[in-house]
Amino acid sequence: MITLRKLPLAVAVAAGVMSAQAMAVDFHGYARSGIGWTGSGGEQQCFQTTGAQSKYRLGNECETYAELKLGQEVWKEGDKSFYFDTNVAYSVAQQNDWEATDPAFREANVQGKNLIEWLPGSTIWAGKRFYQRHDVHMIDFYYWDISGPGAGLENIDVGFGKLSLAATRSSEAGGSSSFASNNIYDYTNETANDVFDVRLAQMEINPGGTLELGVDYGRANLRDNYRLVDGASKDGWLFTAEHTQSVLKGFNKFVVQYATDSMTSQGKGLSQGSGVAFDNEKFAYNINNNGHMLRILDHGAISMGDNWDMMYVGMYQDINWDNDNGTKWWTVGIRPMYKWTPIMSTVMEIGYDNVESQRTGDKNNQYKITLAQQWQAGDSIWSRPAIRVFATYAKWDEKWGYDYNGDSKVNPNYGKAVPADFNGGSFGRGDSDEWTFGAQMEIWW
């Protein structure tokens, strides 16, 4: 029994405990940083095939990058709650002690769970958010990612799966114009590209296997009295089917995606193509993405006994544009890991890229091999933090590149694929090889 003398102390302690619980902040994030050298001299170089949308990342990252996430459950009553989430990202070239940069405010959203009585388990949200992103870690490639400012309702239980609805936005500088004066159009504004996303996930279709289906529609949302650049892509669709299978203490994901017009450029669900690209003082040129994209992707991570883990990826992507400036991209790679102890391992990554230009018919190819000795917090290929020392060798042979010489009003090939020796020039990276070595840390928490 609490006496009256002890009651104020008990109340104070209880209030302090409740206050501490109420003020608890979740701290999550990701970071990587290190130092590297190039065999022929100078700082570490990184290797990516011209025309490829990503690169094999182990021992092949030349920047310091960090995402710092702070979040808190700010209200809870029974099973109903509100959660506030933020994310600030930084990237610098890791060349000096003091490297100033402007942070990117990538997330600021509120998620409300179980707020709709007749939709138990669902979440409504609004704000900037990383929204249900799908990626291949070993090549840092996001193949389904509509992140940005938006709003939505997710995880609606429909009996055989979970339904999610969302709308997000990505803007392009100079994407539309207004009539100014003297027959001049002003391209300094931005075009708002809206994306509307519908997903049906967690459909159990076989033992250990689930299916997710999605449809994304993107369109340019013009202001009144504005017009799109001639030839710009106004809208497009992305259709996605992904099967996830539990296998060998890991997973395998098989993905098929088909996109049209404005959804083909990045091919991940963000609408692009209503914009105008600028190159310093050069004139503007429009981005015409009309056409289609087909992507077939298989990737995963598995455990092969007590001492071996492995990541792998294989992908074919065909972007076929009406302006013949598309590409066909094949990539295949593996990252086996041998565990000497629960905290020390040797990791090797072997990756190959081949990119064919639709316009020239020429091909760029590269293979890259990295060997790394690593110390990590656990015995999984996903264990982090990790500190690794590495050596990387890359060899490439590029027969084409993009022409950015002059300006778009003088050079009819500006921004287009051309042969490596076009007009006596030198486009692409030629035929060469290089090796690098260094040390890196990587962490997520």
Curated annotation (Swiss-Prot):
It catalyses: beta-maltose(in) = beta-maltose(out). GO terms for biological process: monoatomic ion transport. Keywords: Cell outer membrane, Ion transport, Membrane, Porin, Signal, Sugar transport, Transmembrane, Transmembrane beta strand, Transport. InterPro entries: G_neg_Bact_CarbUptk_Porin (IPR050286), Maltoporin (IPR023738), Porin_LamB (IPR003192), Porin_LamB_sf (IPR036998). Belongs to the porin LamB (TC 1.B.3) family. HAMAP family: LamB (MF_01301). Homotrimer formed of three 18-stranded antiparallel beta-barrels, containing three independent channels. This is Maltoporin. It comes from Shigella flexneri. The gene is lamB.
